[in-house]
Amino acid sequence: KPEEIVLLRRWIDDGANAPADEPVPQGPSEHWAFKTPNRTPLPADAGNPIDALLEKSRGKLGLKAQPAAERTILIRRLYLDLIGLPPTREQLEDTRPWKSIVDELLASPQHGERWARHWMDVWRYSDWYGLGKQLRNSQKHIWRWRDWIVESLNADKGFDRMIEAMLAADELAPDDTDTLRASGFLARNYYLFNRTTWLDSTIEHTAKAFVGLTLNCAKCHDHKYDPITQEDYYRFRAIFEPHQVRLDPVPGETDFEKDGLPRVFDDDLDAPTYLHLRGNPKDPDKTRLIEPGVPAILASFAPAIKPVKLPPYAYAPASRDYVMEDRLLDIRAEVQKA
């Protein structure tokens, strides 16, 4: 505002006086979020660790915990939390031990369905759209990724293993078509008309979903608040630069309009990445290549990069035995019609 500019100029003209002992704010890299977490010690007589930590904070504030809710209220909360459905009258009157009810709900298929909805919001699950048969965004048959999420949660698969599969199933499990469904996370970002828009979406939502950072803010310049440089952004892009999407045949079906496995694969390992000056894809700095890597602030957490040898059908899915058998059946059917 003009009046604020006047105040700043007046302050400068007066000598720009400031408190001599004014503390200098810590750099962004000193924020607790970028530090290795330490386990908080719990009292020896602690029951539930969450309750123990809450009680410690309540004590500092002079607060007291509310008494436990009655059992029917707790059962109702439990059902809504774990499976997203209210209990029946009979279930409200269940007298079994609390742990038995919890274990039963955790083992029910509705548990994975209920919690998959929340994670699919974070991971941006979306069916494909286009014009006619033209695919413009996401992928056909992306429901296979949705089913993998539900099944993984119901199988109590570790969150770390789920992330690894969504980002690198094509390299970690090239033989396992069930696990390959996980790469729908990356395939969902597909955008027909602009490769940079496609990769920008991949970078932004991978960082938001898995490291809680707005890496997209560093596309045009260094991040204003987080310790992320513009070069960090393009190093992260270089990780995804080689990848493409495709539909692989599934057993028993050769028509991709009816069914298929949407997935990613490395199409061009030599695809170069350049820093876009001011974020403009029409103005790449071709004086130097950007090597793949995570933001420098996270480098200590990054695993060592190792080459992976893939089977031939990872590049040529039509060479799988079941694909050739299905196509042979199609040909025989056509011959019979003739």
Predicted regions and their residues:
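Sequence context surrounding c-type heme c attachment/ligation sites in exported
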Residues: 1-2, 171-269, 307-314
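Aromatic- and Gly/Pro-enriched helix-to-coil junctions and flexible linker segments
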Residues: 1-170, 223, 243-338
